[in-house]
Amino acid sequence: MLEIKELSFSYNKHKENIFKNLSVNFAKGFNVILGPNGAGKSTLLKAIFGLLRYQGNIYYDGVNLSKINFNKKIELISYLPQMDLNISPLTVLEMVLLGRLPELHQKISDEDIKAVTEILKALNIEDLITRTFSELSGGEKKMVFLAQTLVRNPKLILLDEPTNSLDLQKQLELCQFLQNFIKLKKVDIIVILHDINLAIRYADHIVILSNDGKLYNSGEAKKVITEKMLREVYGVSGNVILDDENKPIISVKKSIRDK
């Protein structure tokens, strides 16, 4: 699926590298990136999407992403960054159409409208279609941006903390939707989450970055979610046991770093 080989990057040549010779493989399906603040999770998604100049190589299904032009790349990959939930005079329909059309003055086909309607319905926000984006709640805006990201039918989807601004029930519903979307559309997703329990419940593959931008571990949840990982990566003390589905359950006791 996605292979990162010898990736090095720094925002400033006079500063220490965020990544230095980082190599990691992602799997097909639902991938989650975990790690503390400052580990470089968002930077990694930007590098994959081609927003940063880096050293090394990133391959998706054997294609070197640094060797293809940006227009070709955005046909292959959709990216939802963390963003300010800004004010826009556009309706939800128009906002999501922007995911398919670079500019709204282009001819809008029946197929475009159908695609937007279907993705809004799949996300259970079709009732928002005629509303103005600026009048929506933070959680509703987040879902509209997600619809805009998914409506192009990309092969690889990068999501930077899409569960922010959502309550727990909405987070669960969103992750379940993404899991179903992967199976239905045969796409791959890499998502940054802060909630380890969400990652355990839904991820096919987990990549854990430490706070120095290094790969700590990667693999299935039962392999990488350990008491040692909680201590060394997150600085918390806790118990990890396996449930009936052989998935880890975490019980955090206290923060080691708060001593």
Task: Describe the function of each predicted region.
Residues 1-4, 8-22, 27, 67-69, ...:
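A short, flexible loop at the N-terminus of ABC-type nucleotide-binding domains that lies
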Residues 49:
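Helix-to-loop junction immediately C-terminal to a conserved catalytic motif
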Residues 54-65:
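Conserved ABC transporter NBD signature motif
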Residues 110-128, 145, 153:
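Conserved ABC ATPase "signature" region
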Residues 132-136, 140:
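Conserved ABC ATPase signature
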Residues 157-161:
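Catalytic Walker B motif of ABC-type/P-loop ATPase nucleotide-binding domains
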Residues 223, 227, 231-259:
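ABC ATPase nucleotide-binding domains
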